[in-house]
Amino acid sequence: MQEIYRVKTSPVALSDNMIIGEKYRITVLTEALVRLEYSEDGVFEDRATQTVLFRDFPKTGYHVVRNADGIEVHTSMLHLIYNEKEFSSHGLSIQIKGNLSAYHSIWHYGEKVHDLQGTARTLDDVNGEVELGHGVVSRFGYSILDDSKSQILLDDGWIEPRKKGVSDLYFFGYGHDYKQALNDFYRLCGKTPMLPRYALGNWWSRYYKYSEESYMELMDKFDEKNIPFTVAVIDMDWHQVDVDPKYGSGWTGYTWNKKLFPDPKRFLGKLHDRGMHTTLNVHPADGVQGCEEMYVDMAKEMGVDYENEDPVVCDPASPKFMDAYFKYLHHPREAEGVDFWWIDWQQGSNCKVEGLDPLWIFNHFHYLDNKRDGRRPMTFSRYAGPGSHRYPIGFSGDTHITWESLDFQPYFTTTATNIGYGWWSHDIGGHMLGYKDDELTARWTQYGIFSPIMRLHSSCSEFNGKEPWRFKKETEEAMEAALRQRHCMIPYLYTMNYRSYAENMPLIEPMYYEYPENAEAYEVKNQYFFGSQLMVAPVTTPRIKGLNVARTKVWFRRASGMISIQACAMMVEECWRFTGI
């Protein structure tokens, strides 16, 4: 692999932090973070994985007590008891020291972990809630990061499957010090990189058959109304879609539709002249067909029979394919002016290598490849498991246009912080199905400016556009005010962007990070800190019938004590100001 695909890692832990037996190894990385390995052949993994890059923590204070039943390991935070046999619920336990709970703060191997949750791969086709994965913080004081099935990162930049039948767990036992737990998660798995400044403004995104002319007319109208955008998201109709059926569905494509965009470089240049950056949508799954302009060159390189137009199969498990994938499909488009890619992978988590998720491959290599010309890299794709925070930005998928979907998004975005995933981009306003509701659109847009990425989106339906002037006056004014305010917040957001990188604190911070001992902080699921200076509780339910007010639950502390209120406010004006606290 090229040098650009080689990731900086430091995966070997200090020997002073290791306790090694015949078939186990315990590594005390911090006084609250312990790596637990078991391998029948007594061979342990010191290379980096997809998830874990850095195990070179400083020397840690701990002591070991050996007895007839096994060993006990003590730190200032933890008490580990282990019988030195294959990991089991009766043979391995860790207790969190301190007065957290009478019995809930003891973990036994294999038990279900009750943490404060993390995030999910996607919100595709979701109406309301979806099951969330694990995070690294818990009211019980501990959580588990299971790295047993991660692929190994090789020194040359490629990956290989790890040995089967091993246990490789990381025990996070930080009590209620959630910030420190998250900080050490980043220390272990790598920092969240900074985003380019332009990513923090407004994005215009729609699945729609635009042409160069119609797109620029739309941007002109936004300019006339003083509605600023910094990112243009061009969905799949940028490429040929109406292809001969022998080439497939046209869902995957890499050749510009010259009927719509006769001069792509000119089109992208016009957007750059406006201060906008562009991402193109790609669905890689169907490979490269004979109708693509770069097909012959890529087929020759891949050894495919191009005279018979055999397809170049999408094989992300092949380094040869991935090299050609960038060389022929993406670099030429970037030379024309494409800034980053929207990787719209929806075909599951299997490929030719067992345990290797194609989504992770595309996210990892697209992000690394995007820095090729010295730019600050970015990609735009779904979540592929712990460690995905290294490849911002996350695309949460095709949600339903319902109040239930809006009501879930603030909570979904907030819990993602618990697994270090701080840059979700949602389909603001929803993508499909559901119903047309002006109030819902206004509220969703208002929430959008206090979400990590403000990306208005809609489907190809003629009735689903998110242009503010499509809605009645009060909604139009609310949307326009929101979009202008988001643009004005770019300096603040960029400061928080740096804070996320430098201080390991995502933009969205759950209330319980600041107030872990207050039960109320866990009850206001849709309330959060938006950077260091703002607290947000968006309105995510319809206004009260017969009144021009809406209700949202808010909790905060004052010098006089703790207050829980049900806040009612005007839909557009008063609630707008309230939401912007």
Residue ranges and their predicted role:
Residues 223-231, 260-279, 331-339, 366-377, ...:
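Secondary-structure transition/capping motifs at alpha-helix termini
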